[in-house]
Amino acid sequence: MRESLTYETGLREECGVFGMFDLEGGDVARDMYYGLSALQHRGQESCGIAVCDTNGPKGVVNCYKGLGLVNEVFHEETLKRLGGNLGVGHVRYSTTGSSTIENTQPLVLKYFKGTLCLAHNGNLVNAFEMRRQLEETGAIFQTTMEIGRASCR
């Protein structure tokens, strides 16, 4: 007996992630905006940019995010306020978790070693089990995304 192969048809996307570092210390926010615009076909629910100045105060991260398209969320004055030479950006196409501002990435996490910015474009296969186990040990989650679960490890 011969097995038949089934192929998915149609567009199937996941989130888009864009990172940038300017060695000369220049502001990356505007270029991040253009990078996310180019990736926007991968996610149109929400977007965000987190930047820091590697020559400035340690642990200071400026983050701006919102629901909607890149050009709806970011405006000239917002990009100017972000300021920094290191950044990560994200456009979201949700496969798990609801489309809320809490689930918009990048996530900015503060922990005992400093500040961490996190963005991803995939799914964890054991996300629900991982969350249950972590909650049993006292972990508290602010989002319904899998990335929050992974960041607690």
For each feature predicted by the language model, list its residue ranges.
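Conserved short alpha-helical segments that host acidic/polar catalytic motifs at enzyme active sites
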Residues: 1-153
